[in-house]
From Swiss-Prot:
Localization per Swiss-Prot or TrEMBL: Cytoplasm
Encoding gene per record: hisB
Name of the featured protein: Imidazoleglycerol-phosphate dehydratase
Main location: cytoplasm
Species per Swiss-Prot/TrEMBL record: Bacillus cereus (strain AH187)
Catalytic activity, reaction form: D-erythro-1-(imidazol-4-yl)glycerol 3-phosphate = 3-(imidazol-4-yl)-2-oxopropyl phosphate + H2O
Pathway assigned in UniProt: Amino-acid biosynthesis; L-histidine biosynthesis; L-histidine from 5-phospho-alpha-D-ribose 1-diphosphate: step 6/9
PANTHER family hit by this protein: IMIDAZOLEGLYCEROL-PHOSPHATE DEHYDRATASE, IMIDAZOLEGLYCEROL-PHOSPHATE DEHYDRATASE HIS7
GO terms (BP aspect): L-histidine biosynthetic process
Entry similarity comment: Belongs to the imidazoleglycerol-phosphate dehydratase family.
EC code: 4.2.1.19
Cytoplasm recorded as keyword: yes
GO molecular function, one term: imidazoleglycerol-phosphate dehydratase activity
GO cellular component labels: cytoplasm
Alphabetic keyword roster: Amino-acid biosynthesis, Cytoplasm, Histidine biosynthesis, Lyase
Length: 194
């Protein structure tokens, strides 16, 4: 089974995270940041991934370190769980509506980290979550996993709905990208490696 478990401990955070690419039955998220827990749960459910996250961070300052470090560990686990990348689609994309909002995510498991994030988040805070941390999370995942990730909010008026559409689209796009494809021999690249 393609899976990984890692721990990251710094003076700011302690993150314990497990990711299962082929078994989406067990999802449990506790980061101390309620809205972020909700988004990670949506990502896992809509991507059909198993995800267990336990995080302790300096949320008395703000949620930045917790959100970013969870992104780093998730990216590291994704990279380790995929290891050879043989037989996977490599590419994935998804449009996801959430009421009046529409989110889009495209992924290339390329071995090259790059991110493009576009979208206006008009409400600066949702509960204890600074909405600008949405981009920081995706940036951390992309860099740690060495993937190319494009995330775009096409339109919408409710900030919660916009971010929710992105996290669901991220799950669905990543599911497509990591899916095994019987028609692909080796890695899906003319270079012979990713």
């Amino acid at each position: 089974m393609r899976e990984s478990s890692q721990i990251r401990e710094t003076t700011e955070t302690k993150i314990k995270l497990s990711l299962q690419l082929d078994d989406g039955k067990n999802v449990s998220v506790r980061t101390g940041v309620g809205f972020f827990d909700h988004m990670l749960t949506l990502f896992a459910r809509h991507g059909r991934f198993g995800l267990q996250v336990e995080a302790e961070g300096d949320v008395f300052v703000d949620a930045h370190h917790t959100v970013e470090d969870v992104g780093i560990v998730l990216g590291n686990c994704l990279k380790e769980a995929l290891h050879s990348k043989e037989g996977i689609n490599r590419y994935g994309s998804a449009y996801v509506p959430m009421d009046e909002s529409l989110g889009f995510v495209a992924i290339d498991i390329s071995g090259r980290s790059y991110i493009v994030f576009q979208g206006e988040l008009t409400n600066p805070k949702l509960g204890d979550f600074d909405t600008e941390l949405t981009e920081e999370f995706f940036r951390a995942v992309a860099h740690a996993a060495n993937i190319t990730l494009h995330a775009r909010i096409l339109y919408g008026s409710n900030t919660h709905h916009k971010i929710e559409a992105l996290f669901k689209a991220f799950g669905r796009a990543l599911r497509e990208a990591v899916e095994r494809n019987a028609n692909i021999t080796g890695v899906n690249s003319t270079k012979g490696m990713l």
